[in-house]
UniProtKB/Swiss-Prot annotation:
Organism: Pyrobaculum arsenaticum (strain DSM 13514 / JCM 11321 / PZ6)
UniProt-listed Gene3D superfamilies: Aldolase class I (3.20.20.70)
PROSITE patterns in alphabetical order: PDXS_SNZ_1, PDXS_SNZ_2
Lineage of origin: Archaea, Thermoproteota, Thermoprotei, Thermoproteales, Thermoproteaceae
Residues annotated for D-glyceraldehyde 3-phosphate binding in this entry: 206
Protein name according to UniProt: Pyridoxal 5'-phosphate synthase subunit PdxS
Length: 337
């Protein structure tokens, strides 16, 4: 179709939709009630289908941690599939110490009003009411996160009580299965947030898939033993073994700071990546955001990843933290069961 023909077609399409809108308004004035085109239960908010389906739409994408509208707009312009609003970036949480809590609701709402991509926010492990508040203001995804200070070390939120999908972190398969059994619609690796060091995320993803591969070759009795060991439903263990992966979308997170880091995690089996401090604690956030988005989407194309890596400079990257220098009590990944 020529350019002129395409424009003519778009004009006709516009006139058609305007005509439909006028017809709708006239019928409304006459008191016409619109019939439901599909059963309500098929699209009801909060169903497993809806809560698991939303994260599936984010595959091969990047969700970026942000603390304000300006950062959120940079993320959107770079091609991020979503933003995660925090009070402080994980690197700053680690440096500041003290109690890390949910971001200000006003800041979250301000971000929601300025970007068109999905907006998520973190809550403290076990803090039901932070989660209820985020659901009330209409966030798209809630992260029950070890980056914030837990209010309950022994019990996570029962996510079946909410209509908004949740994401939780894990270090290995048992942890992931417990979170899914609690209602998590999405899983991510914990890694070690705020370090700019991807080594822990790599370790967690390898542990996750090593266990899944072992289950895939296991007999039924072994699956029963594993379910008891993990304190997870046998049906969930069996489904994971049959699929050869977790039955929910699984993102990588924790220390991703370069396009190569993102591509590595995708190669290890991630469906997408969360990037925390790696972008906005660098000296080239806009270019780095674009480069990580490109490397994540095109991770299986070496030429594209080379192009992405050339977009950033190692000299501009955030100053990383060697995991070995952290004391046990400084590790964020150990929070939660």
């Amino acid at each position: 179709m020529s350019v002129a023909g395409g424009l003519e077609y778009l004009e006709k399409l516009r006139d058609f939709f305007y005509g439909l809108a006028e017809l709708r308004d006239r019928l409304k004035e006459r008191g016409f009630t619109w019939p439901r085109p599909y059963p309500a239960e098929g699209v009801a908010a909060g169903t497993v289908k809806v809560k698991a389906g939303f994260p599936a739409m984010l595959r091969n994408g990047v969700i970026m941690d942000v603390t304000n509208v300006e950062q959120a707009q940079i993320a959107e312009e770079a091609g991020a599939v979503g933003v995660m609003v925090l009070d402080k970036l994980p690197y700053d949480v680690r440096k500041a110490g003290g109690v890390a809590r949910m971001a200000d609701l006003k800041v979250i709402e301000e971000v929601m009003s300025h970007v068109t991509i999905p907006v998520s926010a973190k809550v403290r492990i076990g803090h039901y009411y932070e989660a209820f508040l985020l659901q009330e203001i209409g966030v798209d995804l809630i992260d029950e996160s070890e980056v914030l200070t837990p209010v309950d070390d022994q019990h996570h939120i029962n996510k079946w009580l909410f209509t908004v999908p949740f994401v939780n972190g894990c270090r290995e398969l048992c942890e992931a299965l417990r979170r899914i059994s609690e209602g998590a619609s999405m899983i991510r690796s914990k890694g070690e947030a705020g370090t700019g060091n991807v080594s822990e995320a790599v370790k967690h993803f390898k542990a996750l898939y090593r266990a899944i591969n072992e289950l895939a070759a296991a007999e039924e009795e072994r699956l029963r033993d594993y379910a008891r060991q993990c304190q997870a439903p046998l049906e969930l263990v069996a489904l994971t073994a049959r699929l050869g992966r977790l039955p929910v979308i699984t993102f990588a997170a924790g220390g991703i700071a370069t396009p190569a880091d993102a591509a590595l995690m995708m190669w290890l089996g991630a469906d997408g990546v969360f990037v925390g401090s790696g972008i906005f604690k660098s000296q080239d956030p806009r270019q780095r955001a674009e480069a990580i988005v490109l490397a994540t989407a095109k991770w299986d194309d070496p030429e594209a990843v080379v192009e992405a890596q050339k977009m950033v400079s190692e000299r501009a990257a955030m100053v990383g933290i060697d995991i070995k220098t952290l004391k046990p009590e400084e590790l964020l990944q150990t929070r939660g069961l």
